[in-house]
C-alpha cells in the first residue's frame, strides 16, 4: 500500500514536472497558431471537477487494459493507470504555473544562446531550467502531495486490496460493522501525514515563488 502511494506520487512528480516544463516553455516563448486557444482550454479542463470525468476515464482505462503489454502497466486496476489519470488531471495547473515562471525569465541570455547556434531543447535544459529551480521544486512538492493523498481516483479504478494506497487502507480500517482499532488508524494517519509536515516546514519560500510566478506571468 505504501509502495502504491509512492508509485503514484513519484510518477506524478516526474510526469507533471517534465510535461509542464516543456509545455510551459513552448507557451511562454513561442508564438504558434492556436496558442491562446490552448491556454484557454487548459483553464477550462482544470475547471472540471474530477468526479464529472470518472465515467469517461473508466472507459479509457478499460480500453488501455486490452492493449497487450501496455495494459498490464497502465490499464484498469494498476498503479500506473492511476498515476496516468492523476497526471492528466494535474497537468493544466502545472502548465500554467510553469508558464508563469518562464515568463519571468529574461530573454537576453536565451537569445544569445540561440544566435550562437544552440537548439531550443538545449537552451531549455541548460539555460532556462536552472533559473526556475524553485518553481520546479514547488510544483514537485504539490504534485507529490496530491498523489500521496489521492483517494477518489484510486478508490474508483482499483479492485481489492492489492492496488490500494494509504488513503484507501486508512478508510478500510474504519469499518461500519467491525470495531475500529484506533491505534492502527492513528499510526497510519501519522505516517501519511509525515510528507505534509515536511512540506510546510521546508517549502514556505517555494510557495511564495509559486504565487509570484502565477500572478506575474503574461499571456
Where does each model-flagged region fall?
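A hydrophobic, multi-pass inner-membrane permease signature
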Residues: 1-219
Amino acid at each position: 500500500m505504501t509502495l502504491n502511494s509512492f508509485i503514484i506520487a513519484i510518477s506524478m512528480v516526474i510526469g507533471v514536472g517534465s510535461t509542464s516544463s516543456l509545455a510551459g516553455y513552448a507557451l511562454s516563448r513561442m508564438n504558434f497558431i492556436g496558442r491562446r486557444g490552448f491556454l484557454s482550454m487548459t483553464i477550462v479542463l482544470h475547471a472540471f471537477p474530477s468526479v464529472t470525468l470518472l465515467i469517461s476515464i473508466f472507459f479509457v482505462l478499460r480500453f488501455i487494459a486490452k492493449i497487450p503489454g501496455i495494459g498490464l502497466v497502465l490499464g484498469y486496476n494498476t498503479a500506473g493507470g492511476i498515476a496516468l489519470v492523476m497526471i492528466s488531471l494535474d497537468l493544466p495547473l502545472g502548465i500554467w504555473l510553469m508558464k508563469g515562471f518562464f515568463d519571468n525569465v529574461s530573454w537576453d541570455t536565451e537569445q544569445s544562446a540561440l544566435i550562437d547556434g544552440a537548439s531550443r531543447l538545449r537552451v531549455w535544459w541548460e539555460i532556462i531550467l536552472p533559473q526556475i529551480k524553485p518553481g520546479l521544486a514547488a510544483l514537485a512538492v504539490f504534485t507529490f502531495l496530491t498523489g500521496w493523498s489521492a483517494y477518489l481516483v484510486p478508490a474508483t479504478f482499483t479492485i481489492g486490496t492489492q492496488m490500494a494506497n494509504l488513503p484507501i487502507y486508512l478508510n478500510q480500517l474504519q469499518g461500519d460493522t467491525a470495531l475500529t482499532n484506533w491505534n492502527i488508524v492513528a499510526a497510519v494517519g501519522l505516517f501519511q501525514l509525515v510528507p505534509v509536515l515536511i512540506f510546510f516546514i521546508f517549502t514556505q519560500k517555494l510557495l511564495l515563488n509559486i504565487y509570484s510566478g502565477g500572478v506575474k506571468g503574461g499571456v
